[in-house]
């Protein structure tokens, strides 16, 4: 793509994906609040052995990459404790905080920032990636592991929430209560573009 100047329309998908990522985390963790502590920590089939381990993995990877996008050098220290949050309440608060940091990054992006090289500290090496590619990588990572957690929820007393919808106009009333909890409006998510188009 070189030094192509991107319009706000081209930046919009990154904004909306960041909002969708935060919304999906909010929805999934809100459902998990109804789990018993035993259900939250019980061994289950998945890449990680429990809901707690899976959801904490999403959190620490978000910390790892968001710190790099902010220009930090946290690096592998992000993985020092694989399960920093012992409860769903603590996890929901911590995830919301890192989601806000990611939203702040994306809200501040312009075409130059989207093409900026991010230094990802990996211990003995520093990986250099463009911001746009790193954002897409992080969104895909979170989607992947939320899907695993969603499947694990099927084996509990809590019904898995719907996570397979995006921001369809006709479904705005269905997400209005969650947007209110998050302090969002449709116009905020869609930027200067008409939220109804």
Locate the predicted segments by residue.
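Extreme N-terminal tail/first-helix region
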Residues: 2-19, 189-193
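Helix-adjacent hinge/juxtasegments
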Residues: 72-116
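Active-site-proximal loop/hinge segments within enzyme catalytic domains
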Residues: 119
């Amino acid at each position: 793509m070189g030094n192509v100047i991107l319009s706000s329309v081209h930046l919009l998908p990154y904004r909306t994906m960041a909002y969708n990522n935060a919304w999906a985390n909010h929805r999934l963790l809100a459902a998990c609040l109804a789990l018993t502590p035993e259900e939250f920590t019980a061994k289950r089939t998945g890449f990680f052995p429990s809901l707690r381990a899976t959801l904490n993995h999403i959190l620490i990877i978000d910390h790892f990459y968001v710190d790099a996008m902010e220009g930090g050098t946290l690096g592998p220290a992000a993985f020092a404790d694989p399960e920093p949050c012992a409860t769903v309440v603590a996890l929901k608060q911590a995830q919301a905080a890192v989601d806000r940091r990611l939203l702040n990054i994306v809200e501040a992006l312009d075409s130059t920032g989207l093409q900026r090289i991010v230094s990802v500290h990996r211990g003995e090496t520093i990986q250099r990636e463009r911001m746009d590619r790193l954002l897409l990588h992080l969104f895909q990572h979170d989607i992947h592991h939320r899907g695993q957690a969603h499947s694990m929820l099927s084996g509990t007393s809590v019904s898995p929430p719907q996570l397979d919808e995006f921001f369809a106009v006709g479904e705005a009333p269905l997400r209005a209560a969650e947007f209110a909890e998050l302090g969002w409006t449709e116009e905020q998510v869609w930027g200067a573009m008409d939220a109804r188009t």
